[in-house]
């Protein structure tokens, strides 16, 4: 597979916001945060039931491998949400997160939760004994327009790969990891990340999985790009339901 390197939006001269990005312009500019991904691609485009896989897993480790022993303060916010994030009730109640945060396909949530528990027990065998049980934080978006979700392509090994490959370097974006089969504004969507450096030397980083919107609604820095491009894509097949969703993780080292 040949991956074409594409410019990020700031490299094209578009400047969003008043603060400068960090060195990587990624959530990993926040000290301690690591990100790992596993992309699952199988088969050519085909009808439901053909076993085509366009999916994956994205893992965010707030404090790297020590997230369980070094819990971080956390909160949550839901706007018109109809999706699922496991463990969110505990986060809201305790104000803490003690597991990696994983993102994946809607019908893979159960598998990813189970695999994450296996991973955590392997690394922290005192869970359920000396220490309390855990509820992994796993969020989802629906990639069923490009991915044959009924074939259950996500396996434990994919979750382990995402977790074990997590690093603090640049983060791959676009159709990778959990974003592999996502659509945004009728184009390929996927994973996106950015960061901003604040006065005092603090960093704020964001990672999203984007899976929503119609072409006509696409704007870039206020410019109605979608409306300008629409004539080029007349007659192009599009998914019927575009309400979709977006999942975002925000990290900061500010006090």
Locations of the language-model features?
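A structural signal for small-residue-enriched, beta-sheet-centric alpha/beta enzyme cores
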Residues: 2-255
């Amino acid at each position: 597979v040949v991956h074409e390197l594409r410019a990020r939006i700031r490299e094209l001269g578009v400047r969003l916001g008043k603060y400068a990005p960090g060195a990587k312009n990624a959530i990993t500019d926040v000290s301690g945060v690591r990100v790992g991904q596993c992309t699952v691609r199988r088969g050519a485009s085909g009808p439901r039931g053909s076993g085509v896989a366009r999916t994956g897993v994205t893992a965010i480790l707030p404090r790297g491998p020590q997230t369980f022993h070094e819990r971080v303060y956390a909160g949550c916010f839901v706007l018109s949400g109809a999706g699922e994030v496991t463990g969110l009730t505990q986060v809201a109640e305790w104000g803490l997160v003690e597991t990696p945060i994983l993102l994946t396909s809607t019908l893979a949530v159960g598998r990813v939760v189970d695999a994450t528990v296996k991973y955590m027990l392997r690394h922290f065998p005192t869970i359920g004994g000396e220490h309390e049980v855990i509820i992994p934080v796993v969020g989802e978006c629906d990639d069923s327009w490009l991915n044959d979700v009924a074939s259950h392509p996500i396996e434990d090994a994919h979750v382990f790969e995402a977790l074990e490959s997590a690093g603090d370097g640049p983060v791959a974006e676009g159709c990778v990891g959990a974003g592999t089969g996502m659509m945004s504004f009728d184009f390929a969507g996927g994973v996106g990340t950015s960061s901003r450096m604040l006065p005092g030397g603090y960093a704020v980083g964001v990672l999203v999985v984007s899976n929503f919107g119609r072409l006509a609604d696409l704007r870039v820095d206020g410019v109605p790009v979608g409306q300008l491009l629409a004539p080029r894509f007349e007659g192009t097949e599009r998914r019927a339901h575009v309400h979709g969703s977006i999942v975002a993780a925000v990290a900061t080292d500010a006090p």
